[in-house]
């Protein structure tokens, strides 16, 4: 396995932006594992006509559908059966479906080999919910980015408004709290702080400050 910088944390903690910049600074490839889960969710949303509750599907039904999914990830873009779905998977509705499906063990088992395969070829910065604990437990460097629910909701609210989506701050906060509950309480690979991960609370830090802290820590322990 090549060098892996694994970054975990809840939704809205700044993982994606920080991870991209860290990868750029180190000359590593960036792996957005959340995009892989979103691609699966996008497939299921189309297949089942955007049903609201995917818990209605049995594990066997999900497993059968996974056999039809072919995901390719390159340069930050996600392809589903050859189609670039990178923009479609960012829809808030897909995010909700992703949060539901990611609790399923069959989905996590399906994506595990794909995620790990990237580290066999190149040095990577991998961000997600279980990078430091499950996918890359022996990662070269481990970080956990966090922030208060209010701060994360504000970031999500501003991001969605800028992208043209209509949402209130209260809705954004409720979504963050619900995601936290699902991520931390799920039976399979719950979100948790790895004992050997470096913890960073980004609530009152600028993006550049977070990046500087991560790069300094990487340099110190290199």
From Swiss-Prot:
Pfam families, per database record: Cytidylate_kin (PF02224)
InterPro entries (UniProt xref): Cytidylate_kin, Cytidylate_kinase_dom, P-loop_NTPase
Domain of life: Bacteria
GO biological process: nucleobase-containing small molecule interconversion; pyrimidine nucleotide metabolic process
Binding positions for ATP per the UniProt entry: 9-17
Catalytic activity entry: CMP + ATP = CDP + ADP; dCMP + ATP = dCDP + ADP
Localization annotation: Cytoplasm
Main location: cytoplasm
Similarity field: Belongs to the cytidylate kinase family. Type 1 subfamily.
Name this polypeptide is given: Cytidylate kinase
Native source species: Thermodesulfovibrio yellowstonii (strain ATCC 51303 / DSM 11347 / YP87)
GN (gene name): cmk
